[in-house]
Regions:
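Sequence termini and other peripheral, non-core segments
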Residues: 1-15, 117, 123, 131-135, ...
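Acidic/polar low-complexity flexible segments
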Residues: 68-71, 77-86, 92-105, 197-241
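Extracellular/luminal beta-rich ligand-recognition
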Residues: 74-163
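Surface-exposed extracytoplasmic segments
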Residues: 152-192
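Domain-length accessory/inserted modules outside core catalytic folds
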Residues: 4-6, 24-26, 164, 168, ...
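Charged, amphipathic alpha-helical segments
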Residues: 47-75, 181-195
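Order/disorder boundary and secretion-linked terminal/linker segments
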Residues: 1-67, 227-241
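Beta-strand elements of well-folded, non-transmembrane domains
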Residues: 39-41, 53-57, 92, 117, ...
């Protein structure tokens, strides 16, 4: 099963953002982003995340900082949120026992991925805790190795959009600049058709994106608090995978 999210831009500073980028506010509102979350078997279970982005005009696309894919860049890297960044937050009950659940019920995982292949996974005990930067990496349960992501080769090229729901329905839709990245993360199968990343059950999910246009960052999510804060779990969605 798959679940698709349509992301919208945070509007708190959008007028000022448009002025800094040198475009109309409406042009920024017409940036289209969809993220699909899907449980796939290959042969082990993975959570697959596909990010599909359309920018309404070539002139705006020329201002987008979208780093080119580089195989040599694949690996863990901190502070990706300071650039164009594909993100996802995951939370849920823990897969161990009731004592652990009571202690860590507010814990959650943050996934960061750069279009060029860099990535990072972090674990928080509660809202933005620990507060030190960079956050603590997410390790496998043996604590010997960081958890990584697996990039999908066929999504690594810029291409024309095929999903016209993200673009204008004019005859020029095929010329709209578009970008796609897809990666997956290893999951554990649990009873009652539940899935876990490390020992955190995937119950709530919050895919989001930061797009950097020159020096201006725009924030995209299915829903926003004001000011935008991806860590606020009250705006996360129930996972239906």
């Amino acid at each position: 099963m798959s679940q698709t999210f349509t992301l919208c831009v945070a509007t708190d500073t959008l007028v000022n953002d448009a002025q800094q980028i040198g475009v109309a506010v409406d042009e920024l509102r017409r940036i289209g982003i969809q993220v699909t979350a899907e449980i796939v078997q290959r042969p082990t279970l993975h959570l697959q995340l596909t990010y599909y982005i359309t920018v309404p005009t070539p002139s705006l696309a020329a201002k987008l900082n979208w780093p080119a894919w580089q195989t040599k860049q694949i690996g863990f890297s901190d502070y990706l949120w300071e650039e164009t960044c594909l993100e996802c937050f995951i939370t849920g009950s823990l897969a161990k026992n009731e004592v652990d659940y009571a202690k860590n019920a507010e814990s959650y995982i943050e996934i960061n991925a750069s279009p060029d292949g860099r990535y990072a996974l972090y674990r928080f005990e509660s809202y933005r805790n620990p507060s030190t930067l960079p956050p603590d990496p997410l390790y496998h349960m043996d604590r010997h190795e960081r958890i990584g992501i697996y990039w999908e080769d066929k999504s690594l090229q810029q291409r024309s959009p095929v999903d016209t729901s993200l673009s204008t329905k004019s005859s020029l839709a095929s010329t709209i600049p578009s970008y796609e990245r897809r990666f997956s993360i290893l999951l554990n199968q649990l009873p009652k058709q539940q899935y876990a990343l490390n020992n955190t059950v995937v119950e709530y999910i919050h895919p989001c994106v930061i797009l950097k246009f020159n020096k201006t960052a725009l924030y995209f999510a299915p829903r926003h608090v004001s000011p935008p804060d991806f860590h606020n779990r009250h705006y996360w969605s129930k996972f239906k995978g």
